């Protein structure tokens, strides 16, 4: 029987991972299609994603179907998402005595009435999972505290497509991008992502009004704060762009900003924008509440510039500093490229390999002892 990997959508940056898992383990990807709050509009067409997937994938129709997964699959991998989907996947694995693996992205306890009421259940899932696959070292530390041990936790380094983001971008491509999007001449600062409070959009716009160096803030993405971006002097909103164009935007930018802030329900799990920018040699400015910072990819003054969240003055100062210091930008670009080179899909898949092997072994021991 195949292995079930439960997720919400087929994000394009997960395709190389899911393809490897299908080839190695006969994994089938089951999509429940929820969690729209954290999913960009430009890849919410789940039916199209499933139709185009180069690996076995189908819809998962709610908790009731999830409860029966143990009848059809040898093991179940599920994320910390989807409301009742996670406990249903865990219950199914235990009911049918299958290995259960948690794909963990949370690294700070969410604060809400719902999370408070369900905390005993989530604590049980953390502790009883046969193995945990963590987004990074920061998530591993959080999960280890919940489990009381770091045994059985495997870090799967977050990866993006090198053929898109690490490729050489020509000056002609940059010139064409500028002309196509009517960008003024001069330095550019780049933001890529959803335009929502937790991504620090309001902080970024406040900071931009304080930046002293003449430059253009180029914003790629959409969301409820799009109008605020459009009305900010010196900011140009491009909306959503094809992923194939993003490398040119990163190559154009003197720096890429990732100003995420914590909220009661959200702490940036990773921010793959950091990987994308570093692959292209665009120095990153990120806050301490970005997973790529807490997880060790973006290291202050080594592979990027790190600031406190929610501090527009600090963000403006960091932007001015990078715009004024070409040598610093060059040093961070070289170090960033070297650091992100180890964040590959093969390394990510190996973590799943190890986790599946350990989970299968543990479940086998538990069966023999019961």
Regions found by a protein language model. Give the residues of each.
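A short, well-ordered alpha-helix in the C-terminal region of glycosyltransferases
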Residues: 179, 314, 321, 328-342
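Donor nucleotide-sugar binding/catalytic pocket of nucleotide-sugar-dependent glycosyltransferases
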Residues: 123, 127-176, 183-184, 238
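Conserved acidic donor-binding segment of nucleotide-sugar-dependent glycosyltransferases
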Residues: 240, 299-301, 305-312, 321-327
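Nucleotide-activated donor-binding/catalytic signature segment of Leloir-type glycosyltransferases, i.e.
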Residues: 227-247, 255
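A short, histidine- and acid-enriched strand-loop-helix "catalytic/donor-clamping" loop
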Residues: 84, 98-116, 128-131, 162
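Short hydrophobic beta-strand element within catalytic cores of glycosyltransferases
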Residues: 258, 274, 279-288, 298
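Acidic donor-binding loop of glycosyltransferase active sites
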Residues: 251-269, 282
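Conserved donor-binding/catalytic core segment of Leloir-type glycosyltransferases
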Residues: 183-199, 205-209
């Amino acid at each position: 029987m195949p292995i079930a990997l439960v997720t919400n959508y087929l994000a394009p940056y997960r395709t190389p991972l899911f393809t490897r898992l299908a080839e190695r383990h006969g994994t089938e990807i089951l999509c429940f299609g929820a969690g729209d709050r954290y999913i960009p509009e430009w890849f919410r067409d789940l039916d199209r994603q499933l139709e185009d997937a180069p690996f076995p994938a189908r819809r998962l129709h709610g908790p009731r179907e999830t409860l029966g997964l143990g009848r059809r699959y040898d093991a179940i991998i599920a994320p910390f998402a989807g409301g009742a989907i996670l406990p249903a996947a865990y219950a199914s694995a235990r009911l049918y005595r299958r290995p259960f693996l948690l794909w963990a992205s949370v690294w700070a306890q969410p604060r809400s009435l719902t999370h408070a009421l369900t905390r005993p259940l989530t604590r049980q899932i953390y502790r009883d999972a046969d193995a945990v696959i963590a987004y990074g070292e920061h998530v591993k530390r959080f999960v280890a505290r919940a489990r009381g041990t770091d045994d059985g936790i495997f870090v799967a380094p977050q990866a993006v497509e090198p053929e898109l983001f690490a490729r050489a971008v020509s000056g002609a491509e940059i010139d064409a991008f500028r002309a196509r999007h009517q960008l003024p001449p001069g330095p550019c600062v780049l933001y890529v992502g959803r335009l929502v409070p937790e991504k620090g959009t309001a902080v970024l716009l406040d900071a931009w009004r304080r930046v002293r160096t003449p430059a253009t803030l180029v914003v790629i993405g959409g969301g409820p704060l799009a109008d605020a971006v459009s009305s900010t002097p010196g900011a140009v909103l491009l909306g959503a762009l094809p992923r194939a164009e993003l490398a040119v935007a990163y190559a154009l930018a003197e720096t890429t900003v990732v100003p995420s802030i914590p909220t009661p329900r959200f702490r940036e799990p990773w921010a793959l924008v950091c990987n994308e920018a570093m692959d292209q040699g665009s120095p990153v400015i990120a806050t301490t509440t970005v997973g790529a910072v807490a997880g060790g990819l973006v290291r202050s003054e080594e592979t990027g510039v790190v600031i406190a969240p929610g501090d527009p003055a600090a963000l403006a100062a960091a932007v001015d500093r990078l715009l004024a210091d070409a040598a610093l930008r060059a040093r961070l670009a070289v170090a960033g490229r070297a650091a992100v080179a180890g964040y590959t899909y093969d390394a990510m898949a190996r973590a799943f390999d190890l986790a599946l092997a350990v989970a299968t072994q543990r479940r086998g021991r538990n069966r023999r002892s019961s």
